[in-house]
């Protein structure tokens, strides 16, 4: 299911429109998550960017995305089989700090699970983000039963400060910037 979201944050990407979907343009055994953006209100769209960064021909599917409207950072969650065999499935979260030009991928599920056709699980994933706290939620099969999982991610990465001029001295084995 494709999704669309608008950046209304006070970031450099304010006004951007984003779209995310899955397709099999790389083969029927390689479903991937794709992303496109518009900077002009939807008149023109960027070429499709593959969000999942694996080098496999495995499936990634059922994505959901959001924008932390306090930072403009895009977050997403999807099911992923890059590290597994058969139908065993993991859950990955993605992050873009550059308005959707690139995505960092990281696994959030503690272990893989194997879906079955007798238990529907796909529409039960989502992600919310606010003020550098991210809440991906997903469902999985646990001992034959559908269970819901959430992890709380605190995005506390600090931005390095660029020094234009400084001096340093060593005092008792410590470097002091002045």
Question: What is each model feature region?
Answer:
Residues 157-178:
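Pro/Thr/Ser/Gly-rich low-complexity, intrinsically disordered linker/stalk tracts
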Residues 1-157:
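Extracellular, repeat-based ectodomains that mediate carbohydrate processing or recognition
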